[in-house]
Design a protein with these regions (language model features):
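Alpha-helical scaffold/interaction cores of sigma-54-like transcription cofactors
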Residues: 1-442
């Protein structure tokens, strides 16, 4: 059966990781994960992902070490779907697959961009055109594009059109026509020039965000047991490969199995380096390079990280130079902090590491959880562990809280607050402490 086959593969794989001497806590975690996977009906899903990764490894395709919550699965680690030991790095299985949240697991696979087609071809050859398809995606009419299209339909010449387009203020992120109108005096003058201009702008606002064209999702592939044509509308894509007529979100809501194959240029570079070394008689496995390698850490300390995935921007290089990371954990923390929201804590993290600011914890019981990050909340796993330790949440309950916080779901956050405080009081915490900690993690 699928259950027995997955169990056999995972057990054998984990034994290889530990030279046939599996520590007790790893065996316990593996058994727990396999039980949850089976109870949720996902044995076949893991076998499908294992199979394609096994193919990639068999033809020397360099794959990523693991992305997102899938790195929290010891089964994934045992099957070589990921290369990250979740127990060593305190990664939580419940963040990936939560029995309290009936949802398909989501494993994204990183593949070199110059060999992604080989993997896609393998999937279609294995499962057939009736059971696999790429996914449709829509390009929508953003502010400038919709304004340009409407100007053309209204018969404006190029000079007039670009007057309208130049009136849209520059913005780092996406800007709507309504926001542009509020910010741009020039746009306000154009709109109010005459009645036709008002109609033109109103028409553009009406059409904004509607689909303009369709293309193929850059990464997603759908696989089904039954014939896909019986489940979802299909159309022919490039080279005759079928494409769903439903978008990624709709495909997921139908409960279809979706796997993302992400083509990364950085893995192509890495694969080329490994191949060049092999040609010179040097056999190297990037996954076996020690994470405390001093020469590599020195590169990060200098911010010398061109072509290093997610460390290429000038901003993150400056953070690396200021932090002067002396461990792999420091590098991981920078990657987690360098994004909107958590960026506010970068200075605290740097100053505390260098002893310029006192390390503080919302409650002494959190030192074990926040100690490696100098009292700064960096990872979503830390939110889950805090809810477990301070308020007695199960990790499944803690994951639901984490999701509400990451999606800024105010109703759920407020509802969980009362539950958190009540649980903390039952464990002997003071109400003021519980409130302080909840406000900190929320």
């Amino acid at each position: 059966t699928s259950k027995e086959y997955l169990h056999s593969l995972a057990q054998t794989g984990l034994a290889k990781r530990f030279n046939n001497q599996i520590p007790a806590k790893y065996q316990e975690r593996l058994d727990y994960e396999l039980k949850v996977i089976n109870e949720m009906g996902f044995d076949d899903y893991f076998l499908i992902v294992w199979d394609v990764m096994n193919f990639a490894h068999s033809v020397n395709i360099t794959t990523g070490p693991g992305r997102g919550s899938a790195a929290g699965s010891l089964v994934s680690y045992a099957l070589r779907i990921t290369e990250v030991d979740p127990i060593e790095y305190n990664l939580l299985f419940e963040r990936f697959l939560n029995p309290a949240r009936q949802q398909m697991p989501d494993i994204d696979l990183d593949i070199p961009d110059n060999r992604r087609d080989e993997v896609i071809k393998y999937m279609f050859e294995k499962y057939g055109m009736n059971h696999a398809a790429q996914i449709l995606t829509f390009g929508t009419l953003a502010a400038k594009q919709v304004l340009k299209d409407v100007c053309r339909v209204f018969g404006l010449n190029k000079v007039e059109t670009y007057r309208w387009l130049d009136a849209i203020p520059h913005s780092k992120g996406k800007i709507t026509l309504a926001e542009a109108y509020q910010k741009s005096k020039e746009l306000q003058l154009l709109v109010n020039t005459n009645e036709l201009s008002k109609i033109l702008f109103a028409t553009a606002e009406h059409l904004e965000n509607l689909p303009r064209h369709y293309s193929i999702h850059a990464a997603g592939l759908v696989i089904t047991d039954d014939s896909l044509a019986e489940i979802v509308g299909l159309q022919a894509g490039p080279l005759g490969i079928p494409v769903t007529q439903q978008t990624k979100l709709n495909v997921e809501s139908l409960g279809l199995l979706k796997i993302d194959f992400l083509g990364l240029r950085n893995l192509t570079i890495l694969g080329n380096i490994v191949a060049a070394l092999r040609a010179d008689g040097i056999d190297i496995d990037p996954n076996r390079i020690p994470l405390d390698d001093q020469e590599t850490l020195a590169l990060f300390q200098r911010g010398d990280t061109d072509a290093v995935f997610q460390f290429e921007s000038d901003g993150i290089k400056r953070v690396l130079e200021q932090l002067h990371p002396d461990s792999f954990e420091d590098i991981v923390a920078v990657n987690a902090l360098y994004r909107p929201g958590p960026m506010n804590n970068i200075d605290h993290f740097i100053n505390r590491k260098h002893g310029k600011e006192r390390v503080q914890y919302p409650d002494p019981s959190l030192k074990k959880i926040l100690g490696t990050t100098y009292g700064v909340l960096v990872y979503q796993e830390q939110v889950m562990q805090t809810a477990q330790v301070l308020a007695g949440f199960s990790l499944g309950e803690a994951d639901l809280l984490r999701r509400a916080m990451s999606k800024k779901n105010a109703d759920v956050i407020q509802r969980e607050r009362a539950k958190f405080i009540e649980g903390a009081i039952k464990l002997g915490r003071k109400k003021e402490t519980a409130e302080k900690v909840y406000d900190y993690i929320a």
